[in-house]
Swiss-Prot record:
Protein name, per record: Putative ABC transporter ATP-binding protein DVU_1056
Family statement: Belongs to the ABC transporter superfamily.
Disordered: annotated span: 234-273
Domain ABC transporter: 10-242
Pfam families the UniProt entry points to: ABC_tran
SMART domains: AAA (SM00382)
Length: 273
Protein backbone atom coordinates (compact mmCIF):
# COMPACT_ATOMS: atom_id res chain seq x y z
CA UNK A 1 0.00 0.00 0.00
CA UNK A 2 1.43 3.37 -0.99
CA UNK A 3 0.12 6.72 0.16
CA UNK A 4 0.31 9.25 -2.68
CA UNK A 5 -1.62 12.00 -0.90
CA UNK A 6 1.24 13.29 1.24
CA UNK A 7 -0.73 12.52 4.39
CA UNK A 8 1.00 10.70 7.26
CA UNK A 9 0.75 6.94 7.43
CA UNK A 10 0.66 7.20 11.20
CA UNK A 11 -0.05 10.14 13.50
CA UNK A 12 0.04 10.28 17.27
CA UNK A 13 -1.28 13.58 18.55
CA UNK A 14 -1.16 14.98 22.09
CA UNK A 15 -0.71 11.56 23.69
CA UNK A 16 -0.91 11.34 27.48
CA UNK A 17 -0.23 8.11 29.35
CA UNK A 18 0.41 6.99 32.93
CA UNK A 19 0.94 3.35 33.85
CA UNK A 20 -1.67 1.93 36.26
CA UNK A 21 -0.52 2.00 39.86
CA UNK A 22 1.83 4.92 39.27
CA UNK A 23 1.35 8.67 39.56
CA UNK A 24 4.08 10.04 37.28
CA UNK A 25 2.96 10.44 33.66
CA UNK A 26 5.21 8.78 31.10
CA UNK A 27 3.85 10.80 28.17
CA UNK A 28 2.59 14.38 28.52
CA UNK A 29 1.28 15.46 25.16
CA UNK A 30 3.59 13.54 22.83
CA UNK A 31 3.09 14.09 19.10
CA UNK A 32 4.72 12.02 16.36
CA UNK A 33 3.96 11.71 12.63
CA UNK A 34 5.32 9.12 10.21
CA UNK A 35 4.93 9.80 6.47
CA UNK A 36 5.85 7.64 3.49
CA UNK A 37 9.64 7.68 3.07
CA UNK A 38 10.45 8.87 6.59
CA UNK A 39 13.38 7.14 8.30
CA UNK A 40 13.14 8.31 11.89
CA UNK A 41 15.52 7.54 14.74
CA UNK A 42 13.87 7.87 18.16
CA UNK A 43 16.25 8.67 21.01
CA UNK A 44 15.81 9.04 24.76
CA UNK A 45 17.06 7.69 28.06
CA UNK A 46 15.78 4.43 29.52
CA UNK A 47 12.24 4.87 30.80
CA UNK A 48 11.61 8.05 28.79
CA UNK A 49 8.54 6.57 27.08
CA UNK A 50 9.89 5.57 23.67
CA UNK A 51 8.61 1.99 23.80
CA UNK A 52 5.37 3.13 25.42
CA UNK A 53 4.77 5.50 22.51
CA UNK A 54 5.20 2.72 19.93
CA UNK A 55 2.98 0.37 21.94
CA UNK A 56 0.28 3.05 21.89
CA UNK A 57 0.81 3.46 18.14
CA UNK A 58 0.11 -0.25 17.64
CA UNK A 59 -2.90 -0.34 19.96
CA UNK A 60 -1.11 -2.45 22.58
CA UNK A 61 -1.72 0.30 25.13
CA UNK A 62 -4.54 2.83 25.20
CA UNK A 63 -3.70 6.48 25.92
CA UNK A 64 -5.54 8.43 28.60
CA UNK A 65 -6.05 11.16 26.04
CA UNK A 66 -4.88 12.03 22.57
CA UNK A 67 -5.51 10.30 19.26
CA UNK A 68 -3.84 7.78 16.97
CA UNK A 69 -4.61 8.13 13.26
CA UNK A 70 -3.78 5.58 10.57
CA UNK A 71 -4.07 7.07 7.08
CA UNK A 72 -6.25 9.88 8.46
CA UNK A 73 -8.70 7.48 10.16
CA UNK A 74 -8.82 7.25 13.95
CA UNK A 75 -7.44 3.89 15.11
CA UNK A 76 -9.67 3.13 18.07
CA UNK A 77 -11.39 -0.25 17.64
CA UNK A 78 -10.40 -3.77 16.62
CA UNK A 79 -11.23 -3.26 12.94
CA UNK A 80 -9.20 -0.06 12.58
CA UNK A 81 -6.32 -1.47 14.63
CA UNK A 82 -6.28 -4.62 12.50
CA UNK A 83 -5.92 -2.44 9.39
CA UNK A 84 -3.09 -0.51 11.05
CA UNK A 85 -1.25 -3.71 11.99
CA UNK A 86 -1.49 -5.04 8.45
CA UNK A 87 0.07 -1.82 7.18
CA UNK A 88 2.70 -1.21 9.86
CA UNK A 89 4.98 -3.95 11.15
CA UNK A 90 6.19 -3.87 14.75
CA UNK A 91 9.34 -5.53 16.08
CA UNK A 92 9.22 -6.01 19.85
CA UNK A 93 12.30 -5.25 21.92
CA UNK A 94 12.24 -8.82 23.27
CA UNK A 95 11.96 -11.41 20.49
CA UNK A 96 10.36 -13.91 22.88
CA UNK A 97 7.30 -11.63 22.96
CA UNK A 98 6.91 -12.17 19.21
CA UNK A 99 7.74 -15.83 18.61
CA UNK A 100 5.42 -18.60 19.75
CA UNK A 101 5.37 -21.36 17.11
CA UNK A 102 7.42 -24.57 17.39
CA UNK A 103 9.59 -23.96 14.31
CA UNK A 104 11.06 -20.95 12.57
CA UNK A 105 9.13 -21.55 9.34
CA UNK A 106 5.83 -21.73 11.23
CA UNK A 107 6.60 -18.48 13.04
CA UNK A 108 7.46 -16.62 9.83
CA UNK A 109 4.51 -18.09 7.90
CA UNK A 110 1.99 -17.28 10.65
CA UNK A 111 1.42 -13.68 9.56
CA UNK A 112 0.94 -14.43 5.85
CA UNK A 113 -1.54 -17.17 6.77
CA UNK A 114 -3.53 -14.61 8.75
CA UNK A 115 -3.49 -12.33 5.71
CA UNK A 116 -5.31 -15.01 3.75
CA UNK A 117 -2.49 -16.72 1.87
CA UNK A 118 -2.77 -20.46 1.34
CA UNK A 119 -0.44 -22.67 3.42
CA UNK A 120 1.72 -23.25 0.36
CA UNK A 121 1.89 -19.53 -0.45
CA UNK A 122 2.66 -18.68 3.18
CA UNK A 123 5.48 -21.22 3.33
CA UNK A 124 6.93 -19.88 0.08
CA UNK A 125 6.84 -16.29 1.30
CA UNK A 126 8.35 -17.31 4.65
CA UNK A 127 11.16 -19.17 2.89
CA UNK A 128 11.90 -16.19 0.64
CA UNK A 129 11.88 -13.80 3.61
CA UNK A 130 14.31 -15.98 5.56
CA UNK A 131 16.60 -16.13 2.54
CA UNK A 132 16.51 -12.34 2.22
CA UNK A 133 17.76 -12.03 5.80
CA UNK A 134 20.53 -14.57 5.37
CA UNK A 135 18.63 -17.24 7.32
CA UNK A 136 18.63 -20.00 4.72
CA UNK A 137 18.19 -23.40 6.32
CA UNK A 138 16.58 -22.01 9.48
CA UNK A 139 13.03 -23.10 8.60
CA UNK A 140 13.05 -26.44 10.40
CA UNK A 141 14.91 -25.20 13.47
CA UNK A 142 13.15 -25.12 16.85
CA UNK A 143 12.55 -21.48 17.68
CA UNK A 144 13.10 -21.59 21.44
CA UNK A 145 16.53 -23.18 20.96
CA UNK A 146 17.89 -20.28 18.92
CA UNK A 147 20.36 -17.75 20.28
CA UNK A 148 19.13 -14.28 21.22
CA UNK A 149 20.45 -12.76 18.00
CA UNK A 150 18.96 -15.52 15.87
CA UNK A 151 15.59 -15.04 17.56
CA UNK A 152 15.78 -11.31 16.86
CA UNK A 153 16.31 -11.90 13.14
CA UNK A 154 13.56 -14.52 12.98
CA UNK A 155 11.22 -12.07 14.72
CA UNK A 156 12.11 -9.49 12.06
CA UNK A 157 11.43 -12.09 9.37
CA UNK A 158 7.98 -12.69 10.87
CA UNK A 159 7.30 -8.96 10.48
CA UNK A 160 8.73 -8.61 6.97
CA UNK A 161 6.87 -11.67 5.69
CA UNK A 162 3.65 -9.66 6.01
CA UNK A 163 5.11 -7.07 3.61
CA UNK A 164 4.15 -3.99 5.64
CA UNK A 165 4.31 -0.45 4.29
CA UNK A 166 6.30 0.78 7.31
CA UNK A 167 8.23 -0.63 10.25
CA UNK A 168 8.43 0.27 13.93
CA UNK A 169 11.58 -1.34 15.33
CA UNK A 170 12.31 -1.37 19.08
CA UNK A 171 16.03 -1.88 19.79
CA UNK A 172 16.56 -4.10 16.72
CA UNK A 173 20.31 -4.56 17.30
CA UNK A 174 19.97 -6.06 20.78
CA UNK A 175 21.75 -9.44 20.92
CA UNK A 176 23.13 -9.13 17.38
CA UNK A 177 26.77 -9.92 16.65
CA UNK A 178 28.65 -7.42 14.45
CA UNK A 179 28.17 -9.40 11.22
CA UNK A 180 24.42 -9.84 11.75
CA UNK A 181 24.09 -6.19 12.75
CA UNK A 182 25.74 -5.16 9.48
CA UNK A 183 23.43 -7.50 7.58
CA UNK A 184 20.44 -5.77 9.20
CA UNK A 185 21.79 -2.36 8.17
CA UNK A 186 22.18 -3.61 4.60
CA UNK A 187 18.65 -5.04 4.56
CA UNK A 188 17.03 -1.83 5.83
CA UNK A 189 18.95 0.34 3.40
CA UNK A 190 18.26 -1.97 0.47
CA UNK A 191 14.54 -1.86 1.28
CA UNK A 192 14.58 1.95 1.69
CA UNK A 193 12.01 1.19 4.36
CA UNK A 194 9.77 3.80 5.93
CA UNK A 195 10.46 3.31 9.62
CA UNK A 196 10.82 4.48 13.19
CA UNK A 197 13.74 2.91 15.02
CA UNK A 198 14.35 3.05 18.76
CA UNK A 199 18.00 2.38 19.54
CA UNK A 200 20.84 3.36 21.85
CA UNK A 201 23.22 2.29 19.08
CA UNK A 202 24.28 5.64 17.63
CA UNK A 203 26.20 4.16 14.73
CA UNK A 204 23.26 1.98 13.70
CA UNK A 205 20.90 4.98 13.73
CA UNK A 206 23.36 7.07 11.74
CA UNK A 207 23.44 4.39 9.06
CA UNK A 208 19.71 3.71 8.83
CA UNK A 209 17.91 6.99 9.67
CA UNK A 210 17.85 10.50 8.26
CA UNK A 211 15.84 12.33 10.93
CA UNK A 212 16.31 12.13 14.70
CA UNK A 213 13.79 12.86 17.45
CA UNK A 214 14.04 12.59 21.23
CA UNK A 215 11.46 11.63 23.83
CA UNK A 216 12.18 13.93 26.77
CA UNK A 217 9.97 14.75 29.75
CA UNK A 218 7.00 13.04 28.13
CA UNK A 219 7.06 14.86 24.80
CA UNK A 220 8.66 14.23 21.41
CA UNK A 221 11.09 16.93 20.38
CA UNK A 222 13.72 17.61 17.77
CA UNK A 223 16.85 15.86 18.93
CA UNK A 224 19.58 17.72 20.77
CA UNK A 225 22.06 15.19 19.43
CA UNK A 226 22.57 13.87 15.94
CA UNK A 227 24.48 10.67 15.16
CA UNK A 228 26.92 10.99 12.26
CA UNK A 229 29.18 8.41 10.71
CA UNK A 230 32.70 9.60 10.03
CA UNK A 231 34.78 7.47 7.70
CA UNK A 232 37.98 7.42 9.66
CA UNK A 233 39.57 4.58 11.53
CA UNK A 234 38.85 4.43 15.25
CA UNK A 235 39.59 1.19 17.08
CA UNK A 236 39.45 -0.70 13.81
CA UNK A 237 36.48 0.82 11.99
CA UNK A 238 34.08 3.66 11.30
CA UNK A 239 32.26 5.15 14.26
CA UNK A 240 29.30 7.41 14.83
CA UNK A 241 29.67 10.73 16.59
CA UNK A 242 26.99 12.76 18.30
CA UNK A 243 26.93 16.45 17.48
CA UNK A 244 25.19 18.59 20.10
CA UNK A 245 23.09 21.26 18.46
CA UNK A 246 22.33 24.70 19.77
CA UNK A 247 19.41 25.38 22.04
CA UNK A 248 17.07 23.26 24.09
CA UNK A 249 14.86 20.38 23.09
CA UNK A 250 12.01 21.92 21.07
CA UNK A 251 8.67 20.13 20.99
CA UNK A 252 8.16 18.18 17.78
CA UNK A 253 5.16 19.32 15.74
CA UNK A 254 5.05 16.45 13.28
CA UNK A 255 7.28 18.06 10.67
CA UNK A 256 10.73 16.66 10.09
CA UNK A 257 14.02 18.48 9.69
CA UNK A 258 16.78 16.33 8.26
CA UNK A 259 19.73 16.40 10.55
CA UNK A 260 22.88 18.33 9.80
CA UNK A 261 25.93 18.71 11.95
CA UNK A 262 27.14 21.74 13.83
CA UNK A 263 30.90 22.03 13.59
CA UNK A 264 30.99 24.94 16.06
CA UNK A 265 30.48 22.47 18.88
CA UNK A 266 32.77 19.71 20.12
CA UNK A 267 31.81 16.13 19.46
CA UNK A 268 32.43 12.91 21.30
CA UNK A 269 32.73 9.42 19.92
CA UNK A 270 30.38 6.77 21.22
CA UNK A 271 30.52 3.09 20.37
CA UNK A 272 27.74 0.75 21.35
CA UNK A 273 28.78 -2.70 20.30
Amino acid sequence: MTDTTGNPLLSLDDIHFTYPGTTAPVLRGATLHLAQGDRLGLLGHNGSGKTTLLHIAMGLLRPESGTVHHRNAVAHDEASLAALRRDIGFLFQNADDQLFCPTVLEDVAFGPLNLGLSPEQARERATQTLQGLGLEGFGARVTHRLSGGEKKMVALASVLSMQPTALLLDEPTNDLDPATRQRLIDVLNRMSATHIIISHDWDFLARTCTTFLTVDDGIVCTSRHTPHVHTHIHHGGEVAHEHPSRGCCHQHDGSHHHAGHDDDHPHTSQTTE
